[in-house]
Structure formats: C-alpha cells, structure tokens
Amino acid sequence: MPFQTILFLLPEPQKILSEPITIAVDGISDPGNLGTIIRLCDWFGISELICSKNTVDCFNAKVIQASMGSIARVRCHYVTDLGAVLTKMQKPIYGATIHGDSIYSTKLPNKASYVFGSESHGISKPLFNYLKGEFSIPSFRDGDNKAESLNVANATAIFLSELFRG
C-alpha cells in the first residue's frame, strides 16, 4: 500500500440543524463559487450549507482550495428535495432572483432560509413554489450598457453583508 498523507479529517455531516439563518444553494456548478460561498458562510458564522443534489461536490479539489480551510468548519448537506427540506425547518424561504425586491429597501428577516441559484439558470422552477419572496441586488448603473448579472458568490457576499448589517 502506498504511503498517504492525511491533511485533515472531516466529520460526516449529521442531522441538519435549524439555525436562525439557513443558506442553501441550488445547482451551483462552478467549484470556485461553491468554495467561496462556503468561506462566506464561515466568515458570517453560518455553520452549515444546504445544497441541492445537482450542486458541485463540496469535496472537489477546487472547492476545497477556494474555501481556504472553511470546508472544515461549515457542514455541507446534499439533499434530493431542497424545497421539502427547507420547508421542514418551519421558517420562510426567500430566493435570490434578478427581478426580486431590492435588499436595500426590504427588511430581510433574521430567521429565514435564503436560496441562491445556479450561475446560468438561477433557482430551479420547482423551488419557486416554496418561496415566500424574492430579493435582488440592484445595479446602480443606469441604462442598458451594464453587466447582465452578478457572480453567485459575489451576490452571496453582498447579501450576507447586508443581512448582518441589519
């Protein structure tokens, strides 16, 4: 048997906790984005991330690299039916969309689940049935000559900063 170096051990994720704030991702395919979101959860004190089954594997080498060690402190749970799992937590579910209410003019509940969708398709259609509301980060550039959207990891960072700012 060849020699193997163990960098660190991660416990198997157990039961999903129902913390006041839950962050969920739906269909994130870019490993760098997922790793960054894991790092953001760690930074803001969110100890678990709920992932749809079609989200990139959190143990992908690029995810681990982008998380900068936060993968050891944030539990990632992969679930088959994201909407059903979030509903069982008995708190409102909100989704990040391009046409939602501005996070700057909406009171963001500090006991809720917040869902961020895939980079190219957003939140999956079936999950919309579970949403109590939608939020967005408005562009401050006027006219049509502007970026089409934000990177999902950047949007998550802006959102969490605004949420915790109160």
Predicted regions: what they are:
Residues 1-9:
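A contiguous, low-structure linker/loop signature
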Residues 94-147:
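Active-site/ligand-binding-proximal alpha/beta "capping" segment
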Residues 4, 70-72, 112:
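A generic structural signal for short beta-strands and their flanking turns/coil linkers
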Residues 8-9, 13-99:
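RNA substrate-binding interface of SAM-dependent RNA methyltransferases
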Residues 8, 42-44, 58-72, 125-166:
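Structured adenosyl-cofactor binding patch, chiefly the S-adenosyl-L-methionine
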Residues 29, 63, 111, 116, ...:
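N-terminal hydrophobic or amphipathic segments with adjacent small-residue motifs
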